[in-house]
Design a protein with these regions (language model features):
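Sec-dependent bacterial lipoprotein signal peptides
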Residues: 1-17
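Cystatin/cathelin-like cysteine-protease inhibitor module
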Residues: 19-167
Length: 167
């Protein structure tokens, strides 16, 4: 009897310590998805991440989220305009600026599509996690970005990712 009274609490503590909540697993999966997409995953430095939040379609963002994205993109665009003389002098741009411009144009296309489509809030479709990170690209140049990872309703599968550069 004495042995069981010690083993049962010990076993329950081990089980509790080994269990992670589904939301913690989604954050971990989002980080793994990010690592798998990078040229140099060992150089990844995650600077922030959100807890999983409800998603209502992979193209629906709240007004606050869109405003945040547009503010970030505005800062990046102003940096690019300054470095390239209003995009009139791209030939002298350094590799970092060229890479930033490429990533900004890709993100701008996605954001414009979201805004102009004005996707209404649909039914609950799953979860989303945002990760801010720093890493190096295929040329070894350091960069910063914000990555959105969308999961299915069960939080087990990544269904879409979306990324914008950070200044």
């Amino acid at each position: 009897m004495n042995r069981n009274s010690v083993m049962l609490p010990l076993l329950s503590m081990v089980l509790l310590a080994s269990c992670h909540s589904p939301k913690e697993k989604m954050v971990s999966m989002a980080k793994q998805n990010l690592e798998a997409s990078l040229d140099y995953p060992k150089q990844l430095k995650i600077t922030a991440n959100t807890k999983p939040d409800s998603a209502y379609g992979v193209n629906y963002f709240t007004r606050k989220e869109i405003t945040g994205m547009l503010k970030v993109m505005d800062v990046v665009t102003k940096q690019l305009m300054t470095k390239t003389n209003g995009v009139n002098d791209i030939s002298k741009a350094d590799p970092y600026t060229v890479n930033l411009m490429r990533r900004q144009m890709s993100a701008a296309t996605d954001v414009q599509t979201m805004i102009f489509k004005n996707v209404p809030k649909g039914e609950w479709s799953g979860w989303k996690v945002k990760i801010d990170y720093e890493c190096a690209d295929k040329d070894g140049l350091k960069y910063r970005a914000e990555r959105w990872v969308f999961f299915d309703r069960e939080g087990k599968n990544v269904v879409k990712t979306f990324e914008i550069p950070l200044p």
